[in-house]
Structure formats: structure tokens, C-alpha cells
Amino acid sequence: MKLNVSFPATGAQKTFEVMDDHKLRHFYDKRMGAEITADHLGDEWKGYVFKIAGGNDKQGFPMKQGVLTNTRVRLLLKKGHSCYRPRRTGERKRKSVRGCIVDQNLSALALIVVKKGEKDIPGLTDTTVLRRLGPKRASNIRKLYNLTKEDDVRQYVVKRPLPEKDGKKPRTKAPKIQRLITPVVLQRKRHRLAIKKRRVESRKEAEAEYMKILHLRRRQERIRRRSRLSSMRDSRSSIGEERDKEKEKAAVKAAKKVAKKEAKKEVKKVTEAAKKADAKAAKAKVEPKKADKKSADSGKKATAGDKKEKKVEKKAAPAAAKKEAPKRKPEAAKGDASAAKKEKKQKKK
């Protein structure tokens, strides 16, 4: 079994191949993340403490933390799971992984040195591997070197040496620092703020102009409405005046009619009074003549009364005769009449 040992303090790592099963027996039945002493590997490893980071079996399937078995398992994995890198967004895949328990079927075991022992391990603890890539962001560089805002971050960038060429000076390459505050950045910021300020001012001016136009339009609308109301009032008042004039004319006409009627009544009264006076005067003149006529008329009236009585008697006599006469003729009389008619007809023939 291969033991891949890493030492984070120096950044170095080294692989050791151990064939003795007695030395490897101490790793069996241990889980990932468990810490174990390395004294059983030899005297040079005395005092070292390892942490099991993972491993691969003989077919190359990786160990997965949380799978409590020493065999393979097929799991549906997605983004964020270990032992799987999705090729598409949202992709899931069923993969074969090995459990987190160590046994003899592993081909490689990854170990991390948690505690250094008494002796140095050649190629692991005595050599330091420089970081090829340092922090790129300005705030992370300040955090790494504990810098303040006044310090220049560009001097602390981790540079990478380029391969040397014959007859030329050695060259290094440094990454571009992100979020670095420079005069150009400040100038751009000032420019953005100025544009924003101008935009705000232009918006305020446009709003003021709009409000001015709006007030003007509202004022015009109010004036138009007032003029319309006044014209309607004038039209109503003119209509009312015409109606009042018509009413006055009608009242004048009615008064004239009443005056005419009263005048006619007075004239009638006067004429009637005059007629009555004339009639009284005429009566006063006629009364002596009537007295003379009355004596003559008395004899005439007596004769006239006798004539009337005779007429009444004559009228009463035929009425009584009519009452006494029968309504129907007797049958014998009828027969005689019919016989007489027949004789007349025969004579004519």
C-alpha cells in the first residue's frame, strides 16, 4: 500500500510504499478524519501523528466521507458532493464510491501530518515548497501580511520566477492585483459620481419644467372653466330676464284686461242706472193714462172670460165622446162594411 504523506507547514508531500502488512494493520478499521500515531511505521516516524484524509482502492474508486462501509456503493451525486464534478448545470450522476472505513483492499492512503515528531523526514519536513500562486486580491494580500491601508500592496505580491534563458537576466511574473485602489480608479469613481450628479440635476430641471407647464395648463383649465361657468350664468340670467320680461308683459296685459272689464262694468252700471231712471220717468208719465184704460179694459176682460169658458166647454165635449166610443167595431158592422165594399166593386165592373 502506498502512503501519500503531506506536511502543510512546508507545503511538501511525499509518497512512501509500505509492503509489510503488520505496519499497515494499525490503519485498518479506522475512518476518514481519524488521527493515529505513526510510531509503528519505524523509528524515524516516532512522535508523528497522522490524520486520514482519504484513499483509493485497487480499482481506483475514491473513498467518500460519511459512507460507513468498507465496500463500494453506487450513489446519485450532484454539484457540491465530493468524488463528482458535474459537466452541466444541474446534472446528477450515479457513481461508484468506496466507504470511509480503511481495509486491506486499498492501494493508496492519503495522510496529513498533524504533529511533527523528533526527527526530520528527508524530502518532507526538511524542504519547503514555495507557493506558486499567492493571493491575488488586494484585501487578501493585506490579510496575509497583516498590512494597513497606507502600505503598498504591490510590493508584497507573490511572484513566480520564469525559466532562465542563456545570456538574459532572470525574470519573474506577478499576477494582476484585483480591487487595487489607484488614482485611475479614484478618477473613474469621481467621473461616475459626476455623471450621477448631472443626471440628478437634469432630472430635477426636467421635473421643474414639467411642473411649471402643468401649473400653467391647470391655470388655463381653471380660467376656461370659470369663463364657461360665467357664460352659463349669463345665459341663465339672460333667460331669467327674458322670462321676467314676459311675466311683466303678461302682468301688464292682465292688468289692462282687468281695467277694461272694470270699465265695462262701470259703463254697464251707469247705463243700467240711466235706463232705470228713464224707465221710472216713463212709468210716472204712463200711470195716469193707465188709470183711464183700466176702466175700459174691465168690460173687455169680462167678455174675454166668457169666450174662454165656451172654448173650454167645446173642447171637453169631443173628449168625452171619444172616451165613450168603443175601440173596436162590432163584427156585424164589419161584415156590413165589407159587403158594401164588394157591392161597390161589382158596380164599377
Curated annotation (Swiss-Prot):
Mod. after translation: Ribosomal protein S6 is the major substrate of protein kinases in eukaryote ribosomes.
UniProt KW keywords: Cytoplasm, Nucleus, Phosphoprotein, Ribonucleoprotein, Ribosomal protein
Annotated stretches, region: Disordered: 224-349
Compositional bias ranges of the Basic and acidic residues kind: 231-251, 260-334
Major place of residence: cytoplasm
Gene3D superfamilies in alphabetical order: 1.20.5.2650
Family per similarity comment: Belongs to the eukaryotic ribosomal protein eS6 family.
Protein task: Component of the 40S small ribosomal subunit. Plays an important role in controlling cell growth and proliferation through the selective translation of particular classes of mRNA. Part of the small subunit (SSU) processome, first precursor of the small eukaryotic ribosomal subunit.
Name of the featured protein: Small ribosomal subunit protein eS6
Species for this entry: Aedes albopictus
Phylogenetic lineage: Eukaryota, Metazoa, Ecdysozoa, Arthropoda, Hexapoda
